[in-house]
Amino acid sequence: MPSSTVRFYFDYISSNAYLAWTQLPALAARYGATIDPVPVLFAGLLEAHGQLGPAEIPAKSLWMAKNNARKAAVLSVPLNPPAFHPFNPLLALRASSLALEPAARNALIGALFEAVWVRALHVSEPAVLERIGDEVGVGGAALVAQAQQPEAKASLRRQTDDAIARGVFGVPSMLVGDELFWGYDDFPYVELALAGRDPLDAAQWRQWSGASWPSAMRRRVRPDNAKL
């Protein structure tokens, strides 16, 4: 039976996560699914898996900015350059990890994404977080105070560690049942999973998952005509 929950791993530093968040409620509603938003620290995922972030690779950063501008235009979703990038998302992520009522928490998450990617506000600043908290009716001053407590810090750390243990390596990532999907571009496959029509062939996948290509060997073996 298809899963009725989409676990959504995100970090405000990702414009793809913002685009995904604008579309996820409608997608979930089509299948009567609930959304379980899980803030994680993208930098923690990168470190755990030995990766560089897109912003650390200039060619990739430029390509992704252009690619996301195209996606936003097709979706008719506003997308503007952030005030700073990369930036420290910890305070906003910790605030989003607090035990708020689900509707209020979703409103806060949406407002924080919009603050970064539409309004060019610097969500690393407590005053900005307080303002946004007031705008969505969750009490900005209390929100900032709670987000700075050890419990909020521990929650974000635990969520990030759990995501890593589940194989999450980037944001946004969506978990439907036991299947992990990565990036806004995977939404068609998320939808198929929610509909109970995942096209992945189990027998074929067993062949792929049983294959072994040590990374050290891949780095040593190059085509004869490769130029170093």
Regions found by a protein language model. Give the residues of each.
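Structural alpha/beta surface segment adjacent to cysteine/selenocysteine redox centers
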Residues: 12, 18-119, 204-226
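C-terminal cap of thioredoxin/glutaredoxin-like
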Residues: 6-7, 13-32, 111-228
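Extreme N-terminus of proteins, especially the signal/transit-peptide cleavage junction
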Residues: 1-4
